[in-house]
């Protein structure tokens, strides 16, 4: 059938293409095939299908091919987008039109694609940044700098990159005044807060988090800081971080970027010659420092290790008496996770962005997402096909920079940490030597 076996469906007689229903089924089959193999889908389309469709359908199909091709990093996707003509594209399609143009450093196409997005999408930090970069590349310095200036003061991946592009050093905001005893008592007395804390004590983390989020949703900065401090005192690190993250004018970055289990994590980072801010940045994103955290995929602990991975590493490093029930122990999880992170970094020339992508999605995928030629690190990250991994790498890398600032460590810029992602051929040549 068209959805289950699209290639077989497209290979059969095309008599049904004379009807609207038949053409719709063909589009279903082409769409399903294009998800895994855009080039084969285009081959079927060009072979004997394209001319059987009206113009509007042809443009729709080309836009679909182009979006799938861009996700697969196919250079020809740029031309496929052009074959879609002036058909209105969704913001998601325009995002991928932008991303494939970024991989080719086709700045006019980057600018054009972003400017076709809806106003809401254009004002997202990611597209403000890349539109600003495109303007700078095209010689419109004043306009490009003005755009980057809109987000340069924001504390996230693209805010930091924009600030660096404008030559603005990282400055941690002045620490807000510590919540007073009265402010803490006022927040602690809230019925929702009392329910949340009681649920946490009962081990009902999901229900407790829901209650917490509802309780803090309309708080001002002072109340948020008091709630974050209350979470810290109670060892509820995920709520401390997420609540402190919500402040607008008054900030406490020691609550946004805390270092629980500091001795354990720092010891393992030093033992494996890892950048400590990277380790803390990764743990902040993986588990929010919840020692017994478990994911839907079965990963456990501070550094979210799968049982199979943990067993393999434990054998490798000679950890005696290991069983997966020990993954909730910070010292065990950190020892295994630090070893794995070191191995991943070594496999990718020490590049933390590639290592983070590999840690989240697997080394094989991280390798496949490279280009034949060298890529700017930020472009590699923005063109990761998986939305979850793309956001994960951005968070880990931004976390690393802010932890370095809070901890007083290596003050390298985010751009320098991202580095240049060597082309696939260059890395293969190095591996063969």
Regions found by a protein language model. Give the residues of each.
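Alpha-helical segment of the N-proximal tetratricopeptide repeat
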Residues: 25-36, 65-68, 188-214
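Alpha-solenoid repeat junctions
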Residues: 34-37, 69, 73, 152, ...
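Solenoidal tandem-repeat scaffolds enriched in leucines and small polar residues
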Residues: 1-40
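Catalytic glycan-binding domains that act on GlcNAc-containing polysaccharides
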Residues: 43-60, 65, 75-86, 91, ...
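Alpha-helix C-terminal capping/termination sites
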Residues: 34-35, 70-71, 103-104, 137, ...
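Long, contiguous interaction/recruitment modules in multidomain scaffold/adaptor proteins
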Residues: 1-10, 153-174
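TPR-adjacent "capping" and linker segments in tetratricopeptide-repeat scaffold/adaptor proteins
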Residues: 10-22, 50-57, 82-85, 177-190, ...
């Amino acid at each position: 059938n068209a959805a289950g076996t699209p290639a077989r469906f497209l290979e059969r007689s095309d008599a049904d293409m004379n009807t609207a229903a038949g053409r719709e089924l063909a589009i279903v089959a082409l769409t399903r095939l294009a998800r895994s193999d855009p080039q084969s889908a285009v081959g079927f389309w060009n072979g004997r299908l394209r001319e059987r469709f009206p113009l509007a359908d042809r443009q729709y199909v080309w836009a679909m091919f182009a979006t799938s091709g861009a996700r697969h990093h196919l250079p020809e996707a740029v031309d496929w987008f052009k074959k879609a003509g002036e058909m209105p594209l969704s913001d998601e399609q325009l995002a991928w039109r932008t991303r494939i143009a970024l991989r080719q450093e086709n700045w006019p196409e980057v600018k054009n694609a972003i400017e076709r997005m809806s106003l809401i999408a254009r004002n997202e930090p990611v597209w403000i940044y890349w539109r600003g970069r495109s303007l700078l590349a095209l010689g419109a310095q004043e306009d490009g700098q003005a755009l980057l200036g809109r987000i340069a003061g924001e504390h996230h991946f693209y805010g930091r990159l924009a600030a660096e592009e404008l030559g603005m050093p990282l400055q941690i905001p002045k620490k807000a005044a510590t919540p007073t005893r009265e402010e803490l008592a006022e927040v602690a007395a809230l019925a929702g807060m009392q329910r949340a804390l009681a649920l946490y004590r009962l081990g009902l983390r999901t229900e407790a988090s829901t209650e917490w989020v509802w309780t803090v949703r309309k708080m001002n900065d002072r109340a948020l800081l008091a709630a974050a401090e209350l979470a810290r005192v109670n060892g509820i690190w995920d709520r401390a971080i997420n609540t402190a993250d919500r402040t607008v004018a008054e900030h406490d970055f020691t609550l946004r970027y805390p270092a629980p289990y500091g001795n354990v994590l720092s010891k393992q980072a030093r033992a494996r010659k890892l950048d400590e801010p990277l380790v803390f940045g990764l743990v902040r994103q993986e588990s929010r420092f919840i020692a017994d955290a478990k994911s839907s995929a079965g990963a456990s602990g501070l550094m979210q290790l799968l049982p199979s991975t943990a067993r393999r590493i434990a054998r490798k490093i000679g950890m005696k008496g290991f069983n997966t029930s020990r993954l909730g122990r910070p010292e065990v999880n950190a020892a295994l996770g630090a070893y794995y992170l070191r191995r991943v970094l070594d496999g990718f020339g020490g590049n933390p962005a590639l290592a983070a992508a590999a840690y989240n999605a697997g080394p094989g995928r991280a390798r496949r997402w490279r280009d034949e030629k060298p890529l700017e690190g930020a472009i590699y990250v923005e063109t990761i096909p998986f939305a979850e991994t793309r956001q994960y790498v951005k968070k880990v890398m931004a976390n690393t920079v802010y932890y370095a600032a809070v901890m007083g460590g290596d003050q390298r810029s985010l751009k320098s940490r991202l580095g240049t992602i060597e082309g696939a051929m260059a890395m293969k040549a190095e591996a063969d030597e």
